[in-house]
């Protein structure tokens, strides 16, 4: 591993850490961002708030289709494919957001 120098070490790549690192880098500091996970975003983005809200969104959609019968629009009962649902949550939601943070880090030299 090569020796490197940093002016600011930010511990934690969650919703407090990465914005702080971005702000410092935008002001010309050489920043290193350290996070325990392989993906930036911390617990909230990777396995907490954001994935939970994505799954709650699906639950809301299912409920709305049931309630639409009151307005004359009905659907067949939903069929959940848990493997596809998890894949969507992991790639289209979490993967897209962590990828965006990773790219923003690269652009700023973090």
Which residues are covered by each model-predicted region?
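The conserved SAM/SAH-binding core of class I Rossmann-like methyltransferase domains
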Residues: 11, 34-35
